[in-house]
Amino acid sequence: MFKYLIFGITLLISVNSNAQKNITGKFNTEIVTTHTLNYALHVPKSSKEKKPLLIFLHGSGEKGTDIELVKVHGPFKYLKSNSLDAYILAPQCPDNEYWDSEVLYQLILKIQKENNIDPNRIYLTGLSMGGWGAWNLAFAHPEMFAALVPIAGFVDRVPMIENCKIADIPTKIFHGLVDDVVNVDYSITIYKKLKKCNPNISLTIFDDAGHDSWTRVYDNKEIYDWMFQQTKK
């Protein structure tokens, strides 16, 4: 379990009272919010040498407190019958919340500090809500990641505008053509924008896939091989 506190300072200045005086003032307050994330961490058999770290963000169906849910899809599912010589981090988003980029970033820093991780080989992927979270986290901290793999994720307005912030991150986007939950146009639009400044980007659209375009990606050794070959510039 990971807990993270956010402190905020607000400043309010009042002007123009409606009577015969103008009043100005200063008000300071401290706001504290606590964020708690459960997470699963796979540690490679040999960690004497620095190893890569792969972060997986699940979709909305795996929210909650049952940590086993983060193993239903993605890298942890792959690990049930295969091996990966890397740290695999799968945080769990609480019910009634969505992925918070700053909380995720602080969790990654904690995992880095406590384990023998290669800082130039940190990879980020996610599906559906996790694809959205992966986009947002990559744009918030582009300096951290060596590769990005968003699957069936919607894209916020800011990444659409500031697309070149991740120009140096090799990116593979996947989506189903007949996705009736997250329209494929999200992936098509961000791909076209990123392609102008990121030469190392690809978009794969599965003609026969609905929202679940992730199973065939995460169940395939190729995506892990590709990610682990990438090194941060």
Roles of regions detected by a PLM:
Residues 1-21:
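Bacterial Sec-dependent N-terminal signal peptides
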Residues 46-49, 96-129:
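Gly/Ser-rich "nucleophile elbow"/oxyanion-hole loop immediately N-terminal to the catalytic nucleophile
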Residues 17-53, 127, 132, 137, ...:
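A domain-start/cap signature at the N-terminus of enzymes
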Residues 170-174, 180-233:
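C-terminal catalytic histidine-bearing segment of alpha/beta-hydrolase fold enzymes
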Residues 84, 166-171:
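Short, proline-enriched alpha-helix->beta-strand connector loops that line the catalytic pocket
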Residues 55-59, 152, 175:
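The conserved beta1-alpha1 loop
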Residues 51-53, 57-105:
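Active-site machinery of serine-nucleophile hydrolases
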Residues 112-114, 120-166:
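Primarily recognizes the serine-hydrolase "nucleophile elbow" in alpha/beta-hydrolase
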